A protein has these predicted regions:
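Structural preference for beta-strand elements that scaffold enzyme active sites
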Residues: 2-8, 74-78, 101-102, 146-150, ...
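A conserved mid-domain beta-alpha-beta active-site/ligand-binding segment of alpha/beta enzyme cores
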Residues: 120-133, 162
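Active-site beta-loop-alpha junctions enriched in small/polar residues
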Residues: 8-14, 80-82, 107, 118-123, ...
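Catalytic domains of cell-wall/extracellular-matrix polysaccharide-remodeling enzymes
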Residues: 52-119, 133-136, 140
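Acidic (Asp/Glu)-rich catalytic clusters
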Residues: 1-4, 21-31, 67-68, 140-143
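C-terminal domain-boundary segment and adjacent tail
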Residues: 102, 164-201
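Aromatic-lined glycan-binding groove of carbohydrate-active enzymes
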Residues: 99-101, 136-157, 192-194
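Active-site gating loops and adjacent loop-to-helix segments of metal-dependent hydrolytic enzymes
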Residues: 16-49, 165
Length: 201
């Protein structure tokens, strides 16, 4: 009951939940999402991506699947890889329909500045242990207000290993967020770790 669970809307990895005929701009002929590599190339070349309507249909299928599996609404929604207008607009429509808060880069809250980052991945390029030193040594400065560190800790199964380019980083993230040394440093510096549930209060 203490775990704050959200929906990570994905339109670039694996099979879509919606039937492929309903979301033609998102998937290939097998119903598999076009990859983030393809999407980033399209963005770089100023090519059209996908329609807002297709993104909305898929996001709706995903939130309904979440409700089926978890038995309740997600406490927040965020976006996987792409933060582009058609996807943001689609997810905002989901927010209005289900009243579930949306978290994305560039967001702003009245109660303070948000610094949202994945800066640890730059740190990992030159370090393969003692990841908590990213904070302790000041590589990442925690600012006044709300700071969001986006991490990807978790179990790496066959599907993840064969579809994701982020494997080593997941292991490093797990080591970082479970570090007792980091937890003690946060306590010593009176830095509170909160969930999105606390932000909504």
């Amino acid at each position: 009951p203490n775990l704050c669970l959200g929906l990570h809307v994905n339109v670039t990895n694996g099979y879509a939940l919606a039937p492929k005929e309903m979301i033609p701009s998102l998937v290939d002929e097998h119903g598999i999402f076009l990859s983030s590599t393809i999407r980033r190339a399209q963005i770089k070349n100023n090519e059209p991506l996908f329609s807002e309507e297709d993104a909305y249909i898929e996001a709706k299928y995903q939130i309904e699947k979440y409700i089926e599996l978890v038995g309740q609404l997600p406490e927040y929604i965020d976006l996987h890889v792409l933060e582009v207008e058609p996807l943001i607009n689609a997810v905002v429509r989901i927010y209005h329909e289900y009243n579930v808060p949306v978290c994305y880069y560039g967001m702003d809250l009245e109660q303070g500045i948000i610094d949202q980052t994945m800066k640890q991945y730059d740190y990992y390029e030159e370090h393969d242990h003692d990841f908590e030193n990213m904070f302790i040594d000041g590589y990442y400065q925690i600012k006044e207000g709300l700071n969001i560190l986006v991490t990807h800790p978790g179990f790496i199964d066959y599907d993840v290993a064969t579809t994701s380019s982020m494997l080593k980083e997941r292991l490093y993230d797990y080591s970082l967020v479970t570090s007792e040394k980091l937890k003690q440093w946060l306590r010593d510096n009176e830095i509170e770790v909160i969930s999105f549930r606390d932000v909504k209060k």
